[in-house]
Regions:
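A short, conserved structural fragment
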Residues: 46-56
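Short amphipathic alpha-helical interface segments
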Residues: 2-31
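Alpha-solenoid repeat scaffolds
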Residues: 20-21, 52, 75
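Minor-groove-contacting beta-hairpin "wing" of winged helix-turn-helix DNA-binding domains
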Residues: 57-63
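Short, amphipathic alpha-helical interaction segments positioned at domain boundaries
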Residues: 63-80
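A composition-biased, non-transmembrane "mature-region" signal
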Residues: 22-25, 42, 79
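Short amphipathic alpha-helical interaction segments
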Residues: 2, 31-47
């Protein structure tokens, strides 16, 4: 559950930046970099082709990642 929240949070942040400027990279906070779960989420997104990593902790959404984000609503977006 915690991993999904981190992954979804990254996607929301990156999608917002992508809409503003698709070539802009985002620098992750030290707290995020220190989290093994967050690093795993970034690696997962990178391996899926959704995120490009310039150097460790500096990432941006790829066009593929942005399309996937727009086409698949986040799980907590559904109302019960």
């Amino acid at each position: 559950m915690h991993r999904e929240l981190i992954r979804d949070g990254l996607l929301v942040t990156l999608a917002g930046r992508y809409k503003e400027d698709p070539v802009q990279f985002v620098t992750l906070s030290k707290q995020t970099l220190d989290s093994a779960v967050a690093r795993e989420a970034v690696a997962e997104l990178r391996n899926e082709g959704y995120v490009e990593e310039q150097v460790r902790g500096v990432i941006r959404l790829t066009p593929r990642g942005y399309r996937a984000y727009r086409n698949e609503p986040l799980p907590y977006a559904y109302k019960n």
